[in-house]
């Protein structure tokens, strides 16, 4: 009554089940070819992403230093201590005590501050750069494979981050 019935016409013969080795090899070859094109693009995107994160972190450090200066009506700024580290410092207006470290920004792996970037940018109690520069200070961040971006501070304290671009000369 409930016995399954087999149709002899649809019964696969021995050796005709599953995929052949050639079919599997073709599929693996297609996957390898696609991966050869996609993986470098993903790696390039990740490098640009890390550079963008570093730029936003430096911009945040500058904005925090400006906030410290305006909220405490004192001097505060950022100091590029190393190629991959930016310190946020608050200064004694009288100059009697050393600067207080108010925070540290560690840049992601592979992201460094350019050697020609300003080593220190300070804000006064009004939130403007002191001493007043002739032009807006610009910090260049370098990434891997020639990618770079700029963090620019206007004399009034406005911070902007450029898009990551690639230097084709490298």
What are these regions (language model features)?
Residues 13-15:
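Acidic/polar helix N-cap motif
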Residues 1-11, 25-28, 33-63, 67-170:
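N-terminal helix-rich module
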